Amino acid sequence: MGTLLCAPWQAGAGKWPTNALAHPALCFLGITTALCVIWALSVCRYDRRPRRLDREYAMTLQYQTIADCVGNTPLVRLQRMMGTTSNTILLKLEGNNPAGSVKDRPALSMITRAELRGQIVPGDTLIEATSGNTGIALAMAAAIKGYRMILIMPDNSSAERKAAMTAYGAELILVSKDEGMEGARDLADRMQAEGRGKVLDQFANGDNPEAHYTSTGPEIWQQTAGTVTHFVSSMGTTGTIMGTSRYLKEQNPDVQIVGLQPMEGASIPGIRRWPYEYLPKIYQSDRVDRIIDMGQTEAEETMRRLAREEGIFCGVSSGGSVAGALRIAREVENATLPAHGRRQERADSCR
């Protein structure tokens, strides 16, 4: 093609031939050039017009709001920390959720389902007792939906958690560290009785485990192609382990459900060893095959190892889950990583 186009010019010794229009190659070149100019002018005119998302285009967007980004988190394989074992531990990276933890799932579920049942309406004030990630997730969900959100938490909660909640527009009420989460829950109930708002109550709300039954469980089953043999999770409100275990057991009754709780006297953010009278009402002991008592030191060290050896920056509760999976590595095949650490840890805990 290059030779054809250049030949007439060379033949004319530097002069364009008088019969150029009769040459097929030159006619093609001229038509192509004209079309390119027309196209360029039309593009320039279009670019000068103000751009807007019309209704038809907006309907093709994959995510209409940030709420649509909750769930469908990746499952990755633990590598360097596995040592010589031939077993596989898989980590569910819930930190990929918009507000940074697995709690995004139940937070959005509790508000959305309450709306569908008419239990809350625009203009209502929502109240919740929280120790961290649930509060952050609820603050995000309330911001999306336009609700006023009041969160009650112990005053020894980290500054990072408080800052994240207020950044989403939530109002904080602090109780003393001696009152703890039990005191926060009692205050939430009193405020609701006084008509100051409506308590979502993550500890007794069936929409909490339902969120995991309809999303976390199916995701793990699909991502492992049904080969999961164990599910390991830390226990706080117990919503994650209750909902996920229900789904996995329906698919395969032989899947082993392993829960993590702090050992006596230990304090692990995001995991609780509840007094009997405050045990979450959504908790059903027959859904858990084994409970491991976890120490704070082991959970924190595993958290640091995940960052340094696997490149996974997570929280202490997640470190506890992985520590539990590693502890039973000779029998476990898959574990879940239920939280991401950026929004729950003090900087000095990662040193």
Question: Model-found features: residue ranges?
Answer:
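Residue-identity detector for glycine
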Residues: G2, G12-W16, G30, G341
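Extreme N-terminal basic, low-complexity initiation segments
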Residues: M1-A11, L21
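PLP-dependent amino-acid enzyme catalytic core
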Residues: H23, F28, T32-R351
